[in-house]
From Swiss-Prot:
Main location class: cytoplasm
Source superkingdom: Bacteria
Name of the protein in question: 3-methyl-2-oxobutanoate hydroxymethyltransferase
Organism this protein belongs to: Clostridium botulinum (strain ATCC 19397 / Type A)
Record's subcellular location: Cytoplasm
Amino acid sequence: MRNTVSTFQELKNKGEKITMLTAYDYSMAKLIDSSGINGILVGDSLGMVCLGYENTLSVTMEDMLHHTKAVVRGTSNALVVGDMPFMSYQTSIYDAVYNAGRFIKEAGAHAVKLEGGATVAEEIKAIVKAQIPVMGHIGLTPQSVNMFGGFKVQGKNEKVAKKLIEDAKILEEAGAFSIVLECIPEKLSKIISESISIPTIGIGAGKYCDGQILVYQDMLSMFSDFKPKFVKSFGNIGESIKDGVSQYIKEVKEVKFPEEKHAFKIDDDVINKLY
């Protein structure tokens, strides 16, 4: 049975942790979905881990729709959330609703995610009014990397911490069904999680969030450009891939692959007629 926004709320109410990962293509989505994950975020992080950009700012709506369609086709259990890219909702409320609608209508996503606190409250209200579930995102919001001066922990001083608590309450009031808390102190995320009734999903926000999310390339050691402090490696798939490719190259060079069992047969009398 497909997880829904109601599932997320039920899990929080029961005190059971919510599990999420990113996915960007059909085959990986199918693997992750079959593992029993609650939700999959098609993150604009694909700009960095799939497309090689320095940050997420260059990702377009077309990029996001293309990848979201693939992920939806690979799932039958997880709630699929489409990440609204930079400048797809900041320009106007109309654009926010229109582009959110494209994720649902064209890509088949079940919800969308927006970055920001009070500044995007009106956009969230309008999207929810259009019957589209919205996941909020506060703390380190990668689309604001130029304002932050880099990828840095947020909420370490009283002023910013209080602002994050207030933002979380505003997002709940605006109609968000959950909120991602990224790169904020663990004890602050505890206060936020206890201050609102909707689920919090942490990434670099400690154990007190109602759920956790990671970029799958990070948690499987497949992305070597950098490794955030908050990432734990749950499998060295990157090394396994390199080892497998190296072995493939070796066997092709030494004519050990393909073997007879990998080849298709043809009758000798047919072959003899070809000379």
